């Protein structure tokens, strides 16, 4: 999620399979802090629209995954917010205990710090 230049996102898997997860980070929303998960793959053909104000992350479920992002605004790395993937408050059940994380994901903050 970006503080400045918020984005709607459209996610499509061109190759492979991912578990895609979003969390509602809109403070005035009835579903604030709730998450939603969906499996996207090249075989099921599902795509996923993510509105502004949602945190977004995914887990690759196959050895090779190619994911296409469509965004309504430019990426602004300085305004990106990363929340800890296994924040206990979010109660997201990931199918792995020790995922391979990017440097950015390793530095995620608590959801309560947003």
Question: Where are the regions that the model predicts?
Answer:
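Non-catalytic, conserved peripheral segments adjacent to functional cores
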Residues: 1-46, 64, 71-114
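Conserved SET/PR-domain catalytic core that frames the SAM/AdoMet-binding pocket
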Residues: 42-58
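Basic phosphate/pyrophosphate-binding loop/patch that engages nucleotide-derived ligands
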Residues: 61
């Amino acid at each position: 999620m970006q503080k400045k230049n918020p984005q709607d996102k459209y996610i499509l898997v061109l190759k492979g399979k991912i578990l895609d997860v979003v969390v509602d980070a809109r403070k005035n929303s009835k579903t604030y802090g709730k998450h939603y998960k969906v499996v996207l793959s090249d075989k099921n053909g599902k795509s996923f629209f993510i509105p502004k104000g949602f945190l977004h992350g995914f887990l690759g479920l196959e050895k090779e995954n190619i994911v296409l992002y469509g965004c309504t605004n430019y990426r602004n790395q300085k305004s990106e917010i990363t929340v800890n993937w296994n924040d206990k408050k979010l109660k997201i059940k990931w199918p792995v205990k020790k995922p391979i994380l990017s440097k950015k994901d390793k530095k995620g903050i608590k959801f309560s710090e947003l």
